[in-house]
């Protein structure tokens, strides 16, 4: 496997050739003073040698297997690192979340992987399917990565996705709930420089991958939506040039030259509620082609279920991620209102 990766420099190909597991982990050094460790299928770590590094960056993709643009973006970066085209100055862990689902061309095989973090994999039915086992392993790999160095570290986790439906804001990020911790203006402007100028502040703990890293390691973590889902090879990768350039600068320790925080350059939303499915007959009143961030006025009936109506409570609420087909008990939609900068630092 080492020789295969050394020759091809294509970690995605190695991962897809062994979607369930690798028979062994391995490590090696590149000629440009970079140490590489492969921990599992879809799990590869790069660490610069001989330099003082202060940042730990996790880049995850394919938590949903059919969200291909982030997979291609991460594979480009991994190939550049393996080909010694980049001079790495900070530690990076790449995670290809759900390789079997990539093969299958679906979001998941048995269960939505991004509902299984922060210990959810072992609750209820326990480790009863491959996604639950994978969620536990991914948590362990993040812990291993973030725990490897002590002292003052800047930890980041960007979990990259694409959305099922079209959006009024093509690229947007979900900033996980942080309790009493402030939200980072610097991180928001980093994302703005990546072409992601719309931020959703979550209102409660969740079981997503980004919340896991934020809550347990105080990482600056985000779920980042980079556009709409397309099949592998059909993504217009020019739409991700800014993201790739900023991630490259970050990994290579270059000056980021971020603009000052400016509300005029941003769209900030506060999640005001998450609507969970209670009955099998749940249905939205709007059509399937309604875009993310479509706004509805107070009193508008968003959905019906079990003889009840779900109505808009604020003057206006925008919706994201509507999905009536989830199992009972899971989220069907997030409702948003405008946010200000009162909780930003």
Curated annotation (Swiss-Prot):
Protein name: Succinylglutamate desuccinylase
Enzyme superclass (EC): hydrolase
Function of the molecule: Transforms N(2)-succinylglutamate into succinate and glutamate.
Active-site residues from the entry: 225
Listed HAMAP family: Arg_catab_AstE
Record field: catalytic activity: N-succinyl-L-glutamate + H2O = L-glutamate + succinate
InterPro entries cross-referenced by the UniProt entry: AspA/AstE_fam (IPR050178), AstE_AspA_cat (IPR055438), Aste_AspA_hybrid_dom (IPR007036), SuccinylGlu_desuccinylase (IPR016681)
UniProt: Zn(2+) binding residues: 64, 67, 161
PANTHER family found in the cross-reference section: ASPARTOACYLASE, SUCCINYLGLUTAMATE DESUCCINYLASE
Metal-binding in keyword set: yes
Entry keyword annotation includes Hydrolase: yes
Cofactor binding remark: Binds 1 zinc ion per subunit.
Molecular function GO terms recorded: hydrolase activity, acting on ester bonds; succinylglutamate desuccinylase activity; zinc ion binding
GO biological process: arginine catabolic process to glutamate; arginine catabolic process to succinate
Its EC number(s): 3.5.1.96
Protein family according to the UniProt entry: Belongs to the AspA/AstE family. Succinylglutamate desuccinylase subfamily.
Pathway: Amino-acid degradation; L-arginine degradation via AST pathway; L-glutamate and succinate from L-arginine: step 5/5
Cofactor(s) the protein needs: Zn(2+)
């Amino acid at each position: 496997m080492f020789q295969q990766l050394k020759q091809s420099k294509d970690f995605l190909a190695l991962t897809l050739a062994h979607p369930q597991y690798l028979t062994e982990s391995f490590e090696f050094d590149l000629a440009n003073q970079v140490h590489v460790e492969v921990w599992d299928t879809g799990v590869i770590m790069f660490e610069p040698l001989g330099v003082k590094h202060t940042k730990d960056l996790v880049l995850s993709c394919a938590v949903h297997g059919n969200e291909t643009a982030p997979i291609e973006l991460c594979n480009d970066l991994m190939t550049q690192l393996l080909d010694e085209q980049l001079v790495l100055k900070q530690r990076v862990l790449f995670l290809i979340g759900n390789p079997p689902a990539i093969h299958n061309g679906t979001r998941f095989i048995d269960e939505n992987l991004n509902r299984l973090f922060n210990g959810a994999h072992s609750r209820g039915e326990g480790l009863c399917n491959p996604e639950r086992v994978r969620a536990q392993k991914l948590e362990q790999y993040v812990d291993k990565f973030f725990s490897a160095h002590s002292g003052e570290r800047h930890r980041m986790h960007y979990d990259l996705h694409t959305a099922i439906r079209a959006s009024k804001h093509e690229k947007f990020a979900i900033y996980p709930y942080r309790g009493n911790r402030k939200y980072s203006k610097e991180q928001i402007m980093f994302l703005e420089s990546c072409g992601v100028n719309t931020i959703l502040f979550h209102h409660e703990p969740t079981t997503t991958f980004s919340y896991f890293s934020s809550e347990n390691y105080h990482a600056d973590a985000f779920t980042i939506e980079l556009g709409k889902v397309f099949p592998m090879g059909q993504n217009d990768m020019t739409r991700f040039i800014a993201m790739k350039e900023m991630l490259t600068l970050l990994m290579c320790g270059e000056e980021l030259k971020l603009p000052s925080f400016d509300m005029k350059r941003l769209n900030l939303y506060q999640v005001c509620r998450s609507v969970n499915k209670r009955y099998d007959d749940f249905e939205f009143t709007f059509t399937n082609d309604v875009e993310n961030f479509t706004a509805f006025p107070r009193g508008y009936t968003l959905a019906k279920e079990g003889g009840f109506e779900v109505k808009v409570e604020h003057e206006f609420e925008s919706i994201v991620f509507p999905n009536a087909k989830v199992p009972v008990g899971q989220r069907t939609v997030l409702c948003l209102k405008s946010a200000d900068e009162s909780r930003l630092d």
